[in-house]
Amino acid sequence: MGGYITMETLNSINIPKRKEDSHKGDYGKILLIGGSANLGGAIMLAARACVFSGSGLITVATHPTNHSALHSRCPEAMVIDINDTKMLTKMIEMTDSILIGPGLGVDFKGNNAITFLLQNIQPHQNLIVDGDAITIFSKLKPQLPTCRVIFTPHLKEWERLSGIPIEEQTYERNREAVDRLGATVVLKKHGTEIFFKDEDFKLTIGSPAMATGGMGDTLAGMITSFVGQFDNLKEAVMSATYTHSFIGENLAKDMYVVPPSRLINEIPYAMKQLES
């Protein structure tokens, strides 16, 4: 592969220091779309990951049953009804980066949410596609928008999206599939692989203690937040992915399993430690 994300590589990428005269509008306007009536935890983890990663303004479009929990667990985020198309259109227009998928569900409502987003997203925006949204993309096979698109599949989701069975997912076949797809891909696995248009990277840190539900939602939120804050997409994706595994590996030294909510709490401390 093209290179390895190690601490040395991250040092050259770095997490930028915040400017003294900055304000919340300088750190990304984020929209998260997901969380069906039964899967609200996924979008909540993603939202909290955005908050703890430093996003300036966060809006969550989710099922009304999740609103009270979000207000309680993530008061920093604004919350709107995912079914309110007028408000959703307004928020899409105001947003820099959009994450769709965590807890979205794969029924017709999820299909409709993706179709609506693709009709309204603009070329200057960033789109991060995770979880259920990847499954829906695999079924609908819509034309990708002209904005910058990042997919964050685990191995089974990548099988659906690429058509490559898990046991046949070699680097060469994955690279060919990414080229056909025409997007950035963060393939979540032991030794996560990141595919860009012109080069690829393999993560060399992490821990099996991170193999728990919600960890991918957390990573998707971090990637969305970093991409919304930092100008260079490649550096943002690599920095978010590295930081996620960096925290997990460190926590695993003292914890048998690393809950995503615990990892989220450590994000700002790790970012400070890795700050340029």
UniProtKB/Swiss-Prot annotation:
Reactions catalysed, as given in the entry: (6S)-NADHX + ADP = AMP + phosphate + NADH + H(+); (6S)-NADPHX + ADP = AMP + phosphate + NADPH + H(+)
Binding site for AMP: 216
GO biological process terms, semicolon-separated: metabolite repair; nicotinamide nucleotide metabolic process
PROSITE patterns, sorted: YJEF_C_1, YJEF_C_2, YJEF_C_3
GO MF annotations, alphabetized: ADP-dependent NAD(P)H-hydrate dehydratase activity; ATP binding; NAD(P)HX epimerase activity
Domain YjeF C-terminal: 7-274
EC identifiers of the protein: 4.2.1.136
Residues at which (6S)-NADPHX binds: 42, 105, 154, 217
Presence of keyword Kinase: no
NCBIfam families registered for this protein in UniProt: yjeF_cterm (TIGR00196)
PANTHER family referenced in this protein's UniProt entry, alphabetically: ATP-DEPENDENT (S)-NAD(P)H-HYDRATE DEHYDRATASE (PTHR12592:SF0), ATP-DEPENDENT (S)-NAD(P)H-HYDRATE DEHYDRATASE FAMILY MEMBER (PTHR12592)
Function in brief: Catalyzes the dehydration of the S-form of NAD(P)HX at the expense of ADP, which is converted to AMP. Together with NAD(P)HX epimerase, which catalyzes the epimerization of the S- and R-forms, the enzyme allows the repair of both epimers of NAD(P)HX, a damaged form of NAD(P)H that is a result of enzymatic or heat-dependent hydration.
SUBUNIT field: Homotetramer.
Protein's UniProt name: ADP-dependent (S)-NAD(P)H-hydrate dehydratase
